[in-house]
Amino acid sequence: MSNQSDKSRPAADQLMAKYGSEAFQHAPSMTRSRLEERLAQGDALDQHFIKTFVDFAAGMERRRVLDKRTRWLVQIGQFTATRSSGHLEDTLRAAIAGGVPVREALESILLCQIYAGDTAVAPAVDVFTRVARDLGVLAELRKDQLPLDGHDRERSLEAERKSWKPDEENHPAREALMQKYGWLGVSTGIKYRGAHHLNLLAHREALDSEWAGLWLKFTYQNMYSRWVLDDKTRVICTVGDTFAVGDFVQAHDHIIEALHLGIAPREIMEVVFLIGPYFGSPKMAASLKVLEGILGKQGRVAEIGNPPPVK
């Protein structure tokens, strides 16, 4: 928060006149009051810089490649994964005020347990709890919690098996893995990663079978089977998280998953572009290179404009 006193800070109408209405119409992942604080702080320190940043960030907010809900949920996850508590608070307040369901905002934070761990999620939960209490929405989270066993009791192996492809059904390791670890995590993995999941689980089982079981249950039976967010939103948030932390190996796999789920290349590219204002050009450029490489292999570069190679 800015340390400027209210008396010394320019009025909102003065800030709007100086920096333009665009920033106020498309506040960059923050509430209007917080934008006024940021502008006033920047106005006192370096007016050219704050205008340069706000014009860039507000310009990204103005774009409509992603709907507001998706963009906010992606950014909530990114600011969680990168331990950016100030930006996380700003975005949570803007998102909840803008109509994002509180449960979905929390879920974007909790999913970061997979790729950023508890050292990122625990402080983010503290921020979320404070914001939710301030906004009077904390109590409603008691009403729609999952039971302790999640969706396990509702699931049917017979029903899920019908969606398996021949290479998944006939995979030489599948039956033994299901016998050893149960079918729930294996089936969720098949749903999202296909035969690759079975290959990965077989590899990890050979490394350490006990650890592989713990990993499978945590990641696939539990976290990826929560289904608080729809699959497309969850996966595009995961792509955003991996971009933000610079995990381009996992980003590669989840981009392929996103494309398989029907997420458009331009939607994924928009997540790449959003990296720029908040996490810098190096991560944005690396993320774009990964995406273009995948689209090239799939013969889909035309869907992002057939850009000429950079020499």
Model-based region annotation:
Residues 48-54, 81-89, 213-216, 245-251:
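Short acidic alpha-helix initiation/capping motifs at coil-to-helix transition points
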Residues 86-98, 103, 122-129, 248-267, ...:
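Extended intrinsically disordered, low-complexity coil regions enriched in Ser, Thr, Gly, Ala
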Residues 61, 65, 82-86, 100, ...:
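Residues in soluble alpha-helical coiled-coils and helical-bundle/repeat scaffolds
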Residues 57-61, 75, 92-96, 109-110, ...:
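Amphipathic alpha-helical segments within well-ordered protein domains
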Residues 71-79, 106-109, 233-242, 271-275:
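Short, structured motif recognition centered on aromatic/hydrophobic residues
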Residues 1-68, 121-231, 260, 284-311:
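Acidic, glycine/proline-rich low-complexity segments that act as flexible tails and inter-domain linkers
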Residues 53, 70, 88, 105, ...:
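N-terminal alpha-helical segment
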